[in-house]
Amino acid sequence: MEKQCCSHPVICSLSTMYTFLLGAIFIALSSSRILLVKYSANEENKYDYLPTTANVCSELVKLVFCVLVSFCVIKKDHQSRNLKYASWKEFSNFMKWSIPAFLYFLDNLIVFYVLSYLQPAMAVIFSNFSIITTALLFRIVLKRRLNWIQWASLLILFLSIVALTAGTKTLQHNLAGHGFHHDAFFSPSNSCLLFRSECPRKDNCTAKEWTFPEAKWNTTARVFSHIRLGMGHVLIIVQCFISSMANIYNEKILKEGNQLAESIFIQNSKLYFFGILFNGLTLGLQRSNRDQIKNCGFFYGHNAFSVALIFVTAFQGLSVAFILKFLDNMFHVLMAQVTTVIITTVSVLVFDFRPSLEFFLEAPSVLLSIFIYNASKPQGPEYAPRQERIRDLSGNLWERSSGDGEELERLTKPKSDESDEDTF
């Protein structure tokens, strides 16, 4: 007997429409963000501005937006208790948000380094390593099981990325510039010009901090000498682990216990508060950052692309929060694969990216392994998602199923019977 997918076709169609809309928004913002980071750099693939200033501004935009919406939600629902932290338990729950905030702070900062060393197309291809890191963390942290087909697809994905690394030259001096000359929004003052002229002699230039010495690890390892492992590759592997940990932990505290009933805007306000704190501490504690801001101003070196990047990063972060709250991590990872196709196409057309024959043979293997991974989700009873029902503060009943992520569905009171458990 065929199982009915949904007892309310109108609600299901709206839910599907909202899901596709959220996915499309995330894809557009993620693609735009990568391109804007690349375009905001100068002809030498360095940043005239402090990338941390762009990050702290985007966190501020998100915080202001979420605080304003939170006040409207609190005023409407009379939930003033959400702003009180009278007990140590509530304070500790508040401090939990510092962990994903710190991880996102590192993730947002590393992306500037990565795009200084890698073409945008190569960066998004290698970022598929996050599939592996997410799966490993799901197994270790959330105790989620994978079947042997999924483990095999992850192995194929890993080998494809290694082969892709062996067939590419992605050192910084091989990167093609975008060819744009930026006009600064603010004319530098005399003190700023003096500071910029003296910084090479004092060895405290900000631009120097955004480059690493060329890695030479392969000179001693002859077995792996054909693998051109550069600093960009190492950074993006680190970024994949950090972003996976951030997203998994963020999804966990977004949905655990009573957090499920709390407004996403109130939750995000806590997250972005810590985001501003960590970025602000970086600007204040690092001497070179303090000196540049003191002599040249906070927005020195910013251009039209970096300003657009601030707002795109802000709204992209909000879209990720909605995905983690109402969908799951795997949906987020799948949508990133569409970004891979878009960025690769743009890189060929705009950034003078010339993929080799090996690239055309190996890149589809990456996407194919991802497809196999998601097409072979476990169906056995031992892999069945755990079902639980909870009530929010308004008395509405929610069903929560833990599988690849967290699928949430509101249950109507008169129809909360056994048939509801068959709803997907």
Curated annotation (Swiss-Prot):
Pfam family of the protein (one): Nuc_sug_transp
SUPFAM superfamilies in the cross-refs: Multidrug resistance efflux transporter EmrE
A single cellular component GO annotation: Golgi membrane
Chain intervals for the UniProt region annotation (Disordered): 395-424
Statement: the UniProt record of this protein carries the keyword Phosphoprotein: yes
Bias (Basic and acidic residues) ranges: 408-417
MF (Gene Ontology): antiporter activity; pyrimidine nucleotide-sugar transmembrane transporter activity
Phosphoserine modified-residue sites: 394, 416, 419
Membrane topology: Multi-pass membrane protein
Regions of this protein lying in the Lumenal compartment: 30-53, 117-119, 169-228, 285-303, 352-354
Transmembrane segments annotated in the record for this chain: 9-29, 54-74, 94-116, 120-142, 148-168, 229-249, 264-284, 304-324, 331-351, 355-375
Cellular location(s): Golgi apparatus membrane
Segments on the Cytoplasmic face: 1-8, 75-93, 143-147, 250-263, 325-330, 376-424
Catalytic reaction equation(s): UMP(out) + UDP-alpha-D-glucuronate(in) = UMP(in) + UDP-alpha-D-glucuronate(out); UMP(out) + UDP-N-acetyl-alpha-D-glucosamine(in) = UMP(in) + UDP-N-acetyl-alpha-D-glucosamine(out); UDP-N-acetyl-alpha-D-galactosamine(in) + UMP(out) = UDP-N-acetyl-alpha-D-galactosamine(out) + UMP(in)
Keywords, in A-Z order: Antiport, Glycoprotein, Golgi apparatus, Membrane, Phosphoprotein, Sugar transport, Transmembrane, Transmembrane helix, Transport
Residues the record marks as carrying a glycan: 204
PANTHER family with a match to the protein in the record: NUCLEOTIDE-SUGAR TRANSMEMBRANE TRANSPORTER
Family designation: Belongs to the nucleotide-sugar transporter family. SLC35A subfamily.
Biological function: Probable UDP-sugar:UMP transmembrane antiporter involved in UDP-alpha-D-glucuronate/UDP-GlcA, UDP-GlcNAc/UDP-N-acetyl-alpha-D-glucosamine and UDP-N-acetyl-alpha-D-galactosamine/UDP-GalNAc transport from the cytosol to the lumen of the Golgi.
Subunit annotation: Probably forms homooligomers and heterooligomers with SLC35A1, SLC35A2, SLC35A3 and SLC35A4.
Name of protein: UDP-sugar transporter protein SLC35A5
